[in-house]
Amino acid sequence: MKPVTEMANLHTAVTWSPPQPPFLKINYDGAVFWDSNSAGLGAMVRDIMGGVLASLVDNIPPPQTVVDVETVVARKGIMLARDLNLSSTVLEGDSEIITRAIQAEEQSLASYGNLIEEIRLHADSFLNFRISHVKIKRNSVAHSLTRHARYVSGLVVWMEEVPSHILPALLTEAA
């Protein structure tokens, strides 16, 4: 049996981490549903206590690649934060490709390059902005939202709440 400290570290390694004040965190995720020829987008804005300010899901025609899907949802997440008039945000997703593309100083020539430029433009409108990459296990609520997108038609936004079946994942992360 592992010592308690190691077990605690294992638990910490797979849970959501809150942003540092004064930041709010936008977690996002995207997925392609090949069987239904659609893509799901999920994003959530949370505070330092894990409280939900807003969440969204969208079901769209699938872009060319999974990376394109992740870029579309990153853009939706940052636009949600902008629409909420947030001043300090962390944009966090599990696509290292997108994180690096947003952080890069040069223009992206990839199929999603225009969306990366738009994300950067929106990022400049915040007083404080950070971008963060996280393993999928630490992005489970956004991943659950993305899966829910399979069952919606178009964009759905919730203010200070999430779909009821997402609550168990949210509560597990808060534990």
Residue ranges and their predicted role:
Residues 1-175:
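Primary recognition of RNase H-like, Mg2+-dependent phosphodiesterase/nuclease domains
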